[in-house]
């Protein structure tokens, strides 16, 4: 299967125009899109360890959720040089789908909404990020699901008692900033995401929003595993996971 055919398939599932402005999605490294791909590796991050593993495993197309470069850089030295050197010397194509994969139908946020069987789920933000709906059950049942499928030891900021059948917001990855806490406090009773800070915790307590930090990694990898299964069932090539 050619690299360009894989990219076309991914972009049909997670259209690039869904990505939020400034998100560095799409082809990251590589130029021969007519190359025949024999093994695809999938990972959350294009870390040096992931790229080294891709080389070791004979991966020739590396898909990552997070892009290789987020901010503009002025030179290619240190770790970024090491990453590029391995990718280019081994002719490994690197491709990323980030917020477009978060937002798209059956993407990472829909995977969380489906896990909790949210009633009437809708996008949490106008740009399509996150999901919010009614969780039909108790807070304890919600935590049991979280611990079983997402993270065994989530951080729970229980700012108030939660009635059954509560409004639950979910957002895969980084969602527990102070601005997000303030926004979601007007939308939901409970908020599951990742990357809680000390000041966000205090703000959640003050606003009466129950927050569950199941980590950036775990809230995204749950849906990424589903995406890997989807690719495996639709693409005629070997697909392996590299960091989950």
Swiss-Prot record:
Keywords: DNA-binding, Metal-binding
Sites where the protein binds a divalent metal cation 2: 66, 216, 220
Residues binding a divalent metal cation 1: 65, 102, 220
S-S bridge residues: none
Keyword Metal-binding among UniProt keywords: yes
Molecular function as annotated in GO: DNA binding; metal ion binding
Entries under Pfam families matching the protein: DUF34_NIF3
GO cellular component: cytoplasm
Assembly with partners or alone: Homohexamer; trimer of dimers, that forms a hollow cage-like architecture.
NCBIfam families noted in UniProt: YbgI_SA1388
Family: Belongs to the GTP cyclohydrolase I type 2/NIF3 family.
Role noted for this protein: DNA-binding protein exhibiting the ability to bind to both single-stranded and double-stranded DNA.
UniProt protein name: GTP cyclohydrolase 1 type 2 homolog
Organism this protein belongs to: Methanocaldococcus jannaschii (strain ATCC 43067 / DSM 2661 / JAL-1 / JCM 10045 / NBRC 100440) (Methanococcus jannaschii)
């Amino acid at each position: 299967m050619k690299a360009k055919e894989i990219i076309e398939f991914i972009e049909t599932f997670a259209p690039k125009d869904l990505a939020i402005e400034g998100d560095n999605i799409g082809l990251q490294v590589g130029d021969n899109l007519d190359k025949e791909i024999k093994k695809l590796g999938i990972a959350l991050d294009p870390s040096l360890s992931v790229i080294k593993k891709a080389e070791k495993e004979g991966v020739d197309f590396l898909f990552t959720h997070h892009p290789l470069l987020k901010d503009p850089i002025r030179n290619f030295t240190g770790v970024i040089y090491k990453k590029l050197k391995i990718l280019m010397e081994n002719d490994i194509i690197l491709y990323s789908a980030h917020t477009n994969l978060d937002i798209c139908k059956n993407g990472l946020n829909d995977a969380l909404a489906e896990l909790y069987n949210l009633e009437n789920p809708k996008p949490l933000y106008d740009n399509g990020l996150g999901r919010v709906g009614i969780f039909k059950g108790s807070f304890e049942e919600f935590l049991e699901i979280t611990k079983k499928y997402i993270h065994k030891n989530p951080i729970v900021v229980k700012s108030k008692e939660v009635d059954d059948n509560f409004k639950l917001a979910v957002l895969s990855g980084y969602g527990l900033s102070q601005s997000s806490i303030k926004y979601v406090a007007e939308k939901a009773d409970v908020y599951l995401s990742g990357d809680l800070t000390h000041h966000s915790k205090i703000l959640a307590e003050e606003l009466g929003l129950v927050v569950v930090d199941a980590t950036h990694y775990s809230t995204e990898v749950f849906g990424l595993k589903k995406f890997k299964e989807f690719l495996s069932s639709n693409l005629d090539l070997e697909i392996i996971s590299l960091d989950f």
